[in-house]
């Protein structure tokens, strides 16, 4: 908001969240003075457009299959925070199948915009710096889905998830799965799959987690 500095905007978000109000927040950083965020047309138009453009949401069967284990563990009507929600796919599935009021946290502006366009409340926040906008015990469930392997401080993220929710559901790619190990052994290359579609030089995954 052009009327408030960033710290005051965050205080407003915290107050609205504590009061149980619907709130989304995004902070576009700029180093060229007051109102200079208005010059960042590429990002500003996408963020604002997310609130103005409501996309039709259809939950596909493959999306249900992808998140079936999370669906089993979330009770109907629960309050859920999806930490690292991406484009909001999991929130779409939970809303359609469990009647869940789900919110998200996302740092990527383009994926943030997509989740907001799907009608979800999303907080723009770097989870490596904590979830300062979310009060203690505010949610029934915190979901950390395919996010833990991308953050610098996984332990800190898990502590934050259990601070803001009664329980946490954590999913991640199993980097020791036999198919991955076999591909690595036979080709000598980082495996690429639907769940891990990245090359070694552009992957966001910085931890190889296994069971």
Task: Describe the function of each predicted region.
Residues 26-57:
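Catalytic active-site module of serine/aspartate enzymes centered on a nucleophile-bearing elbow/loop
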Residues 155-163, 167-211:
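S-adenosyl-L-methionine-dependent methyltransferase catalytic module, highlighting the catalytic core
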Residues 130-136:
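Short conserved loop adjoining the S-adenosyl-L-methionine
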Residues 78-86:
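Conserved class I S-adenosyl-L-methionine
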Residues 3-8:
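Conserved alpha/beta-hydrolase "acid-adjacent" motif
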Residues 61-77:
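Conserved alpha-helix/loop element of class I SAM-dependent methyltransferases that forms part
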Residues 89, 93-130:
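Class I SAM-dependent methyltransferase SAM/SAH-binding core
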Residues 141-152:
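A short SAM/SAH-binding and catalytic strip from SAM-dependent methyltransferases
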């Amino acid at each position: 908001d052009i009327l408030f500095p960033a710290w005051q905007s965050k205080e407003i978000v915290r107050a609205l969240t504590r009061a149980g109000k619907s709130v989304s927040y995004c902070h576009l950083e700029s180093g060229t003075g007051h109102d200079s965020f208005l010059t960042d047309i590429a990002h500003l138009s996408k963020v604002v457009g997310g609130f103005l453009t409501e996309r039709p949401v259809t939950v596909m069967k493959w999306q249900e299959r992808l998140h079936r284990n999370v669906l089993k563990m979330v009770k109907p009507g629960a309050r859920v925070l999806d930490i690292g929600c991406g484009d909001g796919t999991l929130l779409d599935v939970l809303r359609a199948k469990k009647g869940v009021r789900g919110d998200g946290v996302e740092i990527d502006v383009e994926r943030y915009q997509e989740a907001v366009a799907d009608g979800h409340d999303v907080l723009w926040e770097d989870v490596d710096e904590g979830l300062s906008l979310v009060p203690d015990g505010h949610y029934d469930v915190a979901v950390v889905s395919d996010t833990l392997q991308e953050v610098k401080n996984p332990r800190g993220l898990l502590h934050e998830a259990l601070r803001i929710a009664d329980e946490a559901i954590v999913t991640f790619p199993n980097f020791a799965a036999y198919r991955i190990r076999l591909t690595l052994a036979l080709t000598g290359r980082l495996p690429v799959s639907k769940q891990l579609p990245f090359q070694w030089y552009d992957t966001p995954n910085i931890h190889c987690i296994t069971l």
